[in-house]
Design a protein with these regions (language model features):
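Active-site-adjacent loop/helix micro-motif of nuclease/hydrolase catalytic cores
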Residues: 253-263, 305
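Domain-level recognition of nuclease-like catalytic cores that cleave nucleotide substrates
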Residues: 282-305
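Active-site ExK catalytic segment of metal-dependent nucleases
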Residues: 245-254
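Short beta-strand/turn micro-motifs composed of small residues
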Residues: 226, 280-281
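Accessory nucleic acid-recognition modules appended to NTPase machines
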Residues: 70-244
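Switch/connector loops and helix/strand junctions flanking conserved nucleotide-binding motifs
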Residues: 2-6, 26-30, 178-179, 256-257, ...
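Arginine/glycine-rich "motif VI" loop of SF2 helicases in the C-terminal RecA-like domain
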Residues: 214-215, 265-273
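Interdomain motor-coupling "hinge/lid" segment immediately C-terminal to the ATP-binding subdomain
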Residues: 4-114, 118-119
Length: 305
């Protein structure tokens, strides 16, 4: 009878695991970015101005977060991204699973890219590429293992209650999402035709915060919220002590009181647990919306930190 194979060393207590992301905007600019720390230190209370507008944010999305791709002209960046996905799904994937279909995985990835910012309906997403719900779920976990996709779970205000609602799955590299959906930067810059910017910008903000969460001073989790009666909040940042920073992302160049209505509702529900409600916009200046609520430029994510 053959001897039992020794179990691999878990390295418990000697190795700390972490998720792998592309460069943050702060890293690209050579500066420290820690938005949560800035909020906790009261940075939102000071008037803040950024020199960026809608077209500038589209350029950031188009460049993406992968160091090699960022430096390339747009035409060659598209070729690089195509090669990157093909090699990752065609060769590297074999290390994780020999039962997967690279073509369907790419179609699934493109479907996720097209739904940036939306709750993921697994049956609908898989049905579009003739996959069962269980296989679709397995494939999405493979895409997470390849660091192409991240899961944004639904937020439950009470830890004693079960998690409710659907997760959001998002591509953390905006350039890859745009490439997979054949989204033109010129269209995104157009106020009439650029409706897709909203979902891409929401995923971009979420990805920036995910990157910052790996080095920030205060530990926090990132999720999204949908109440039983349909109120939605794009991102919930919850600190270890239970305090919350709630985030909405708008592609508009300004924010109105209506854009913050769900944040104001949350403020009424959780009271002092809410440190701040933030509406990110493509405006070039911040505005106080009353109470603990502010509208700020997206660039505050890395310029305030």
């Amino acid at each position: 009878m053959p001897a039992a194979q020794p179990a691999g060393d878990s390295l418990a207590g000697r190795v700390v695991g972490t998720r792998v992301f592309g460069f943050s905007q702060g890293e690209r600019a050579g500066r420290r970015d820690d938005f949560v720390r800035a909020v906790l230190r009261g940075a939102l209370e000071a008037q803040y101005r950024s020199g960026m507008g809608r077209a500038d944010y589209v350029d950031l999305l188009t460049a993406g977060s992968m160091p090699e791709a960022c430096r390339l002209p747009q035409r060659y960046r598209a070729d690089w991204l195509e090669s990157y996905v093909s090699r990752l799904l065609g060769r590297d994937l074999r290390e994780f699973s020999r039962l997967s279909d690279p073509r369907r995985l790419r179609s699934l990835l493109a479907g996720l890219a097209a739904a940036q910012g939306s709750e993921t309906v697994v049956a609908r997403l898989g049905g579009a590429v003739n996959l069962s719900a269980s296989t679709t779920t397995s494939y999405m976990e493979l895409l997470r293992a390849l660091h192409l996709v991240e899961r944004l779970p639904p937020w439950t205000p009470n830890l004693l209650k079960r998690e409710v609602g659907r997760s959001k799955y998002l591509l953390t590299d905006s350039a890859l999402a745009m490439r997979l959906t054949r989204t033109s930067p010129d269209i995104l810059k157009d106020l009439v035709r650029g409706g897709a910017l909203g979902g891409l910008l929401e995923a971009f903000v979420a990805a920036e915060l995910m990157r910052q969460s790996t080095w920030c001073e205060e530990r926090f989790t990132i999720s999204h919220y949908r109440s039983p009666d349909g109120r939605e909040i794009d991102l919930i940042l919850e600190l270890d002590d239970g305090r919350v920073i709630a985030v909405e992302v708008k592609a508009a160049s300004s924010a109105s009181a209506a854009d913050a209505r769900h944040l104001r509702w949350l403020e009424g529900r959780i009271g002092d647990r809410l440190v701040a409600g933030v509406v990110f916009t493509t405006d070039d200046r911040s505005r106080h919306l009353g109470g603990r609520l502010w509208a700020v430029p997206v660039a505050a994510l890395w310029e305030l930190g």
